[in-house]
Amino acid sequence: MEIQPRLATESIAGQRPYQEDAVLAQALSDGRIVVAVADGMGGHAAGDVASALAMETLVQALEDGQALGDAFTLANSRVHSKSREPGKQGMGSTMVAAVIDGATFTVANVGDSRCYLLGADGIKQISEDHSFVAEAMKRGQSEEEALSSRFKDVLTRSIGIDEQVKVDTFGPYPVENNTALFLCSDGLYKVMTNARIRELFGRSGGPRGAAQSMVATAYEDGSDDNISIALAEFGEVKRDRAMDTMPIEFVPPPADDTADDAADDGADDDVPIVAAAPAAVEADDDTWNEDWDSSTAVTSRGGQNTMLIVVGVGVIGVVLTLLFLMAA
């Protein structure tokens, strides 16, 4: 017997001056259901375009009968083509999606937005992160070591950065009663452990209450990124009814619009206000250390300023050396 899921989404700009995430949870014309999260990068007038275009293409491709992985491939192609336009260079997006087809579901992802399966027995991450941290941990580094690296915000795959991208797909898996598919951007899970995500979900009333409460908590816990959730709950995941410990609805203060206003004053809206991310490449085992060449990977939202600082320090060092030699 098919279990009809209850759907919910929640997304806020948080402490960022603009929103680059996109979320959806909707039924397709053939009765299948798609839930997805995309986290754009590229700055004002670029990151939001990338995530929105990736989502739009995903839905169109699924409506046309394409498989989930093929829909991601088409999304990558369209975003990459769009990135050739003035002011859009270097834009890209992560994307994670689940398609529920009757009694089964399938998951696909590119980047580090995540899909979890929540149930009475805990939480399991279905998707795999395409990031420096994830790759470093696969090669034996501890999570603490990987997160202390200056490359901790670097992505190894992204929608739209390269002409082609490898898409990871998972499933199909059977839909089980009293479980939930929980998709989120890194703005949420970077301030919460997996256990914390399951705990907070269990304290919230229904999918809508869970989405609102968890976005609110991530914001209050200091997330400095856009925060987004899309979920589908089958039946009802076991919950702790101590509702007084969690807010049911939270509206954060509006983001500071000064960055947008400054960009609008006599400037071309198509010009991004952050540097474009370099292209991604496959790395061998020797690259995952502190000598790793960051110029060969996609840089996620928080990492671009760090890379610019590294380059700037190097240039300053060269200039000072030349001046010293001339004086001598």
PLM feature spans:
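PP2C/PPM-type serine/threonine phosphatase catalytic domain
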Residues: 1-328
